[in-house]
Design a protein with these regions (language model features):
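Short acidic, gly/pro-rich beta-turn/loop elements at beta-sheet edges
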Residues: 19-21, 32, 63-65, 91-92, ...
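Hydrophobic-ligand binding "helix-grip"
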Residues: 37, 58-108, 114-116
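Solvent-exposed residues in well-ordered beta-strands and their adjoining turns
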Residues: 12-16, 97-99, 112-118, 147
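Hydrophobic pocket/interface hotspot
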Residues: 20-24, 30, 53-55, 70, ...
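A conserved amphipathic terminal alpha-helix motif
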Residues: 116-161
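Short, surface-exposed, polar/charged, turn-prone segments marking secondary-structure boundaries
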Residues: 35-41, 48-51, 70, 81-83, ...
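Hydrophobic ligand-binding cavity/cleft-lining segments
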Residues: 1-49
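Short, well-structured hydrophobic secondary-structure segments
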Residues: 50-60
């Protein structure tokens, strides 16, 4: 097994697509509200294609550091590409679709994670890595859903005293 792992996860959120997209793009809120408890974000100088940020993630006893470039596409989707660090080559695409769940309207968030496999490691640990990535993506989507439905407002900004 070598090549790529591609995982897709859909999550329904009880908010409009504009609010969910604004939430996903608001890195300062993700850092201040500690949406993902094992994650720290720090914005860097913009790269050649758009905003860049550093992501420190704690996994067990070790911390990984990644530099991520964000691309906002014309169709409204957002592409995060990991350009430096332990997860180099990984990309996450977030798409936001208007959806209705019975009597309620909301947003269907479609997350697609693509991870390259190293040739030797892919054969040995490919299935284990796929299960781990699926669990991480599900946890990430649920954290987004809970925080948005808790009452995210796009006007909130961090202010220095």
């Amino acid at each position: 097994m070598s090549g790529f792992i591609e995982i897709q996860h859909d999550e329904w959120v009880a908010a409009t697509p504009d609010i969910v997209r604004a939430y996903y793009n608001d890195l300062s809120h993700r850092e201040v509200a500690r949406v993902h408890p094992r994650e720290r974000l720090r914005q860097l100088a913009p790269g050649p294609t758009g905003p860049r940020f550093e992501r420190l993630a704690r996994a067990g006893w070790r911390t990984t550091r990644d530099v991520v470039e964000r691309h906002e596409r014309a169709d409204g989707s957002v592409l995060d590409q990991f350009v430096v660090g332990a997860h180099w080559g990984r990309s996450i695409v977030a798409r936001f679709y208007r959806s209705s769940d019975g009597a309620r309207t909301g947003t269907l968030v479609e997350l697609t994670l693509t991870q390259p496999l190293r040739p030797f490691v892919g054969r040995l640990l490919g299935r284990w890595q796929r299960r781990r990535l699926e669990a991480e993506l599900r946890e990430f989507a649920v954290d987004i859903k809970v925080d948005v439905e808790r009452g995210y407002r796009t006007a909130r900004r961090l202010r220095a005293a």
